[in-house]
Amino acid sequence: MDMVKVKINGIEVEVPAGSTILEAAYKAGIDIPTLCYLKDINEIGACRICVVEVKGMRGMVTACVYPVADGMEVFTNTEKVQKARKMNLELVLSTHNQDCLGCVRSGDCELQKLAKDYGIKDTKAWSGMNMEWPVDESAAHMYRDNSKCILCRRCVAACGVTQGIGVIGANERGFETHIASAFEQPLDSTSCVSCGQCIVVCPTGAIAEKDDTDKVWAALADPTKHVVVQTAPSIRATLGECFNMPIGTNVQGKMVAAARRLGFDKVFDTDFAADLTIMEEATEFLHRFTEGGTLPLITSCSPGWVKYCETYFPEFIPSLSSCKSPQQMFGAVAKTYYAQKMGLDP
C-alpha cells in the first residue's frame, strides 16, 4: 500500500494514499468537527463544518471528502477556519427550529454542542427561510420533524446504504429541500421496517422515538392499575454506560430496585419468555420435521425482521416461525396466566 506524508498543524503523519484529510487528522490526534459525516456511509461534505485550509490553495476544503497528497500542509484551527465554521453553523441554525427546551435531544444534540463550542448565542445576523413542515407521527414507534432537520442526509444513508431499504430521500430543491418518503407518503404507508437506524444517526431531534413516559407516569399514579414491567436481557449489561459505568457492568439489581421505587408493582425479566420461545420454536420445528412442514424454520423473534421479510422477501414467509417474540409472549402471559394467578382483571 502506497503511503504519503502529510503535515497537519505542524504535526507530520503518514497515511495510506487516498485517505481524506479528516482521516489523517484523526490519526494525528487532531479533532475536526463534523455534522454530516459517517465513515464509509455518508461522506458527502454537505454541512461544511469540517472546512480546513490547505497551503497553496485559495479556498478552504471539506476535510471529510478531500484526499491528502504527499507533502500537503493542512491547517485546521486558523482564524479564517474558525470564522467559516461559525458562519456555516449560524446559517444552519438560522433555518432550524430552535425550540431546544422542548426537544428530545436537548443536551445530547450534536448541533447544540457545536453551537456552544463556537460561542453562538443567536442568529440575528442571518434571516433564514423557516419553512412550516408538518410533523409525521403516523408510525407507531417514531416521528419525523423536518423543522429540526439540517439536511445532513445521515438518515438517508443509514436507510439506503446500511439497511438497503431506501424509504427516505431528499425531495424538492433550494429552500424547499426536505427529507421525505417518495410522493410525500406518511411513514406508516411506506416499506419502512422500523429498524430505527435513522434515529440512531440523526444529529438533532428531526427523527426520534416516540416517548411514552407521560403514559407510564399516569399508569403508575392510577391506584386502580397493577403495573408490571419487563426488561430485556441486554439492558442489565448496557444501561450502566448511561451513568458512566464501565462497559458491561451488571446493573440488574440497581435497575430492579429503581423500577420498584418508581412504583412498578412487579419487575420481570424477558429471559423467562425467551425460554418459552425456545420451547415453542423447538416444538414447531419437530412438528414440521416429522409431519413434513415447510423447512427451514426461520425465527420470528424480532418483529422488525418479520416485517422486513413480509415486505421484501414474501417468498420466505412460509418458513417463518408462527411463534411470537419473547417480548410479545411475555405480554400475552402477563395478561392471561399472571393476571389469573394474581386475581387481576387484565
What residue ranges belong to the model's regions?
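Iron-sulfur-associated redox domains of electron-transfer enzymes in respiratory
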Residues: V4, A17-N77, V81, K210-P346
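Short, contiguous acidic and Ser/Thr-rich linear segments
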Residues: N9-S19
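Fe-S ferredoxin-like electron-transfer domains
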Residues: R48-S194, V200, I207-A208, D212-H226
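Eukaryote-biased recognition of intrinsically disordered, low-complexity regulatory segments
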Residues: M1-I11
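Short Gly/charged-rich anion-binding patches and loops
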Residues: T20, E110, R144, R154, ...
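Structural motif corresponding to the C-terminal cap of alpha-helices
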Residues: Q163, C202, Y338-M342
